Amino acid sequence: MKRKHTKWICLGLVLCLLTGLALGCNSSTNKTETATSEDTAQTTDQTTETTAAAAAAPDGNPSADMGGRPDGNPPADMGGRPDGTPPGGMPGGPGGMGQPPAGGPGGGPGGSSADIEYKGAVKITSADSQSGQTYASDTADESALLISTGDAVTIDDATVTKSGSSDGGDSCNFYGLNAAVLVKDGADVTITGGTITSDAMGANGVFCYGGNGGRNGAAGDGTTLTIRDAVITTTGGGSGGIMTTGGGVTYAYDLTVTTSGQSSAPIRTDRGGGTVYVDGGTYTSHGLGSPTIYSTAEIHVANASLTSNLSEGVCIEGKNSIELTDCDLTANNTKCNSNASFFDTIMIYQSMSGDADSGTSSFTMTGGTLTSKNGHVFHVTNTNAIINLNGVTVVNEDGEGVLLSVCDDGWSGAGNVATLNAKGQTLEGLLLVGSNATLTLNLTDGSAFIGTVSGAITNAKGATVSTEVGTVNVTLDGTSTWTLTGDTYVTSFTGNASRVITNGYTLYVNGIAMTGTK
């Protein structure tokens, strides 16, 4: 009996041991499967986050502060090589640096110039001087003339023709692929006289690439282009007249530039920005999304005629600037481009695409004539803009008579803020300030404003944008006047009430009717 019990006890122990091993293996298997599932989920989450981050990443266009931009200023006589001294009559301009409404320069991530195989029908790679030559290319992604050297090059009375479209996209916009004439790698190039003609997609006329393919804030490699007395004509889309990117420096004198394609500003900049000085000449655009000037840079223009026949007159994106001195600017914006839902002559905005840093945009105009044939004279959206006007003749031919609108449009991510500084200026029209917008109006040095403020805004597509006025702050010095053309509501008023001519209407400040007005 004892042995039988012992036998059964041993059998029981064996069964328990086998059962335990089986359970242990099963438990281990379950843990392994669970861990694998968690690892897979974690990997999936990481992949999703990485992909989302990549999709949301800025595409690396110029940073707008241009803190390290080339410091070359135009030559004193506007006739020789740049010597660092601003010419007489050429504005020094603000130090701040900043795609027209969709369809303009820029876009998604654009890689780098190191990824591009540059080709030229004629290549100049050392110091040279050529006159009366013909340069031609009908090959895609090939320039007619490629100047790639750190030396000085002079080209006189050239005939340049470029055909052969490119699908290079941002490689054309940012780095100069397929341009009729491409100047890069620290070259110091002077082009005088001659004609430059391109009839292809992505074929800018003359492209000055400063080597900094990233966002603004980094200096270029010293590439400098001086071009004078030349005729530039482009007909394809994405084909500006004179194009500056990557911190390049361009000086243009007495040019005749005509563009016909979409996204083809006669004076055009893109990723990496740069500095552009223009004195004299005629600049005309006929295409959609092709203002006469598109700024992702610091641009100064004097004594020039600027005409846009379909698009805005000029466009500034982000923390960038345009300064006009004694220019005649005319725009007839009759077709909205992509996200845009207003017609306007001066467009200041931020797309949040990464093509320009966010910050204060600056438009300054002194003297000259500003003619707006259709839409609002000024339109500010999704950015902080400063508009300086001094002795400008403003002609508003649009029936609605809107001088300035500050409100939502087709972009979001930043506020709608504008400051209008009028000095010795006569202004007339309606100021539209959306319910989530802020306008500061400063009238000084004998300025006169005839008009009112409203928050009732409908865009060109017929959609209601705002029904109530936002924040409006007005400062009126002792030499300036404001004549009302309707009951007006502002948030604050600084100045002598007697300088406000009510004209039978009432000015309300923070909801209270102002007294002491005329």
What are these regions (language model features)?
Residues 504-518:
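Extracellular, surface-exposed repeat architectures
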Residues 30-115, 212-219, 352-355:
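Disordered, low-complexity segments in secreted/periplasmic proteins that are enriched in proline
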Residues 114-132, 147-165, 172, 177-198, ...:
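Surface-exposed loop/turn motifs in large extracellular/passenger domains
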Residues 26-28:
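Bacterial signal peptide processing site
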Residues 21-24:
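C-terminal motif of bacterial Sec signal peptides marking the signal peptidase cleavage site
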